[in-house]
């Protein structure tokens, strides 16, 4: 079931997010950085609770198996643009349409206030094919900084209205 997240979901959202990072970015980001990511980190859980209105989740058998975070675009001053900040699906539940359903849920929410959505993902991320498949138009690259390391992301644009 896809639904808006509530404050009680924060711990599970952080867990899905951290496991998503560890699985997706293995051999991409420094392993020491990934090893430090803690799914039980109280600070991360608190931050998630503070922004819980930006999250939706997929719950199956009372377990959060996927999450999406969305809101105003942080990369642009154009108020007509929203952004998908994060989308992670537990590896055991991938290739079942959950990611597509979460994106569509977020688009419906964002359509109320915005005309466009941007999604950025690392150029080497296998998710690039997914974002193209669901209608993303490649609009350029942007830099992503992680500590002192710079990575390049592809940006995809979606028309909401």
Language-model-detected regions and their locations in the chain:
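Conserved active-site alpha-helix within GNAT-family acetyltransferase domains
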Residues: 100, 124-140
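Terminal substrate-recognition subdomain of acyl/acetyltransferases
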Residues: 150-161
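Short proline/glycine-enriched turn/loop segments at secondary-structure junctions
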Residues: 143-149
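Acetyl-CoA-dependent GNAT
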Residues: 4-10, 15-28, 32-91, 103-105, ...
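Glycine-rich phosphate-binding loop
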Residues: 93-96
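Conserved GNAT acetyl-CoA-binding A-motif
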Residues: 110-122
């Amino acid at each position: 079931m896809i639904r808006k997240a509530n404050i009680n979901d924060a711990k599970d959202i952080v867990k899905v997010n951290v496991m998503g990072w560890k699985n997706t970015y293995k051999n991409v980001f420094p392993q020491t950085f990934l090893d430090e990511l803690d799914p039980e980190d109280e600070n991360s859980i608190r931050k998630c609770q503070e922004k819980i209105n930006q999250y939706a989740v997929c719950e199956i058998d009372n377990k959060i198996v996927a999450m999406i975070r969305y809101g105003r675009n942080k990369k642009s001053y154009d108020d007509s643009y929203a952004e998908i900040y994060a989308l992670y699906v537990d590896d055991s539940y991938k290739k079942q349409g959950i990611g597509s359903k979460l994106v569509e849920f977020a688009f419906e929410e964002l359509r109320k206030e915005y005309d466009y959505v941007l999604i950025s993902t690392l150029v080497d991320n296998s998710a690039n094919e997914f974002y193209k498949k669901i209608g993303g138009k490649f609009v350029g690259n942007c830099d992503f900084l992680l500590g002192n390391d710079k990575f390049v992301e592809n940006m995809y644009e979606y028309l909401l209205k």
